[in-house]
Amino acid sequence: MSTLYLERSVADGRRGDWTEELDLSGVDRIVVGTGPGSFAGVRAAIAFAQGYALGRPSCEVFGLPSPCALAGDGRVAVVGDARRGLFWVALFDGFRQNGDVFLSDAESLPSAVPDGFRVVTTDEARIGESLRGVFGPRYTGGGTPTGEGLRRFAEANPAALVREPLPIYLTPAVRPAAD
């Protein structure tokens, strides 16, 4: 089985010429990070994977929450900036996610992360100092979810793979006001 784990970002350019370098022959499984993250980026990744697989009946698309890419080494809480004074939190025991990604306000954050969990963030520049103040030595710094991290998690815990992935939405959609 050939699985595609690929890292791209908006900073890599929108032209798409990077796809010319890809050898996609024989790929029969694509794993994408489902967020939390850039709304457009997560949706674009899922659309790319689904579009590629559309004409290839043997190619399956799976998703994993993006914080899975930072898990695997003991008990870890991955914390991100959800904006508007909120944080998103994902808890892991090795390669097992303990529940869904959830939101916490700043006041509740210390109790949202159980004792014995080290804390990392995907948003070091924005919230690293704040997390260091809240968690002290339990805070071990920032990390970036990578395709390699998703690969490690998927291979260690294939049951965690989600068929027909959707982006993680932390807050409900806001409907336009009626005129």
Predicted segments with their positions:
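Oxyanion-binding and handling regions
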Residues: 1-16, 24, 61-179
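DPxDG-like acidic metal-binding loop motif
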Residues: 29-60
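Helix-loop module immediately N-terminal to the HCX5R catalytic loop
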Residues: 20
